Structure formats: structure tokens, C-alpha cells
Amino acid sequence: MIDDNGYRLNVGIVLCNTHQQVLWARKYKQHYCWQFPQGGINIGETPEQAMYRELFEEIGLNYQDVRILSSTQYWMHYKLPKKLIRWKIRPICFGQKQKWFLLKLLSKDTRINIKSNKDYTFDRWKWVSLWYPIRRVVFFKRDVYRKVMQEFVDVIIS
């Protein structure tokens, strides 16, 4: 779903474990492209419903495996670089408008299954320190990642 300003409505997921680490996943066949799970909100879905759907589609977890600890107060935006905009596809998407969720893993991490869906998004995952993703995510997402982690840090370390 794309809003009137050309932003695709989306949810982002920060999944943390009991060691104050966050799940970091590599995009399928994109050796240097790592990110948090995220995905679009379908028409008729709430952000929370989209988050649970994406959680299952991308890392194979369901609502019983996690607990929502927090969500961002505001929607976060990032613009795509011009070379990544698909100019011939309508409506044109200029970037993402995201609601982020902080989740605590309740199950063992052996439940994480990045190949639970035939069209899987990721081919590897690992636990990383809290601030690691900000230095490693693709440049146009860094500001959003920084804001998200600043909003969630107190909850993660408590």
C-alpha cells in the first residue's frame, strides 16, 4: 500500500534475545545487504497484523514465540536513492513509511526459520550487539535505524 506522498506503508521488526542482542539477517543472494525484518502493510491490515504476518513469512516465528515490548511512537520515513525507484511502475514508490516493533524472543532461537516461506527473504541470520546494525545497514536506512534504536534502547537494556 502506497500513501499519497509515494511512501510504501511498512512495518519493521527488531527482535531481541535475553542477552540484549538483536536479530540481523542477510537478504537472499545479496552478500553485503543485511537488515532487520520488514515488510509491507496490506490493504485492510493493521500495523500489528502486518508485523505478525511478516514475522512468520520472514523468520518463521508466530505470536506465541514473541512478546511485543514496544513500538515506535511515530512513523519513520526513508527515501530510496533515485537509482532504486521503479519509475515505470505505478503508483511510484519513493520510499518507506514504517511503524517499528520491538519484540522479545520467548522461544529458543532454534525456532527461527528463515526458509519457512518458499519465497524467502533472507539466507543467513545472526545475533549482533544493539548498535551494530546502524553501522552496517545500507546508507539510506541508517537515519531510521538510529532513531528506532534510540527509541528502543532503554527497553532492550532494562
UniProtKB/Swiss-Prot annotation:
The enzyme class is hydrolase
EC number(s) from the headed UniProt entry: 3.6.1.-
Q: Which cysteines are joined by disulfide bonds?
A: none
Output the superkingdom of the source species. Bacteria
Q: Where is the signal peptide?
A: none
According to the UniProt entry, its GO molecular function terms are:
mRNA 5'-diphosphatase activity
Per the entry, which co-factors are needed? a divalent metal cation
The record's function comment reads:
Accelerates the degradation of transcripts by removing pyrophosphate from the 5'-end of triphosphorylated RNA, leading to a more labile monophosphorylated state that can stimulate subsequent ribonuclease cleavage.
Q: What protein does this entry describe? A: RNA pyrophosphohydrolase
Name of the gene encoding the protein in the UniProt record: rppH
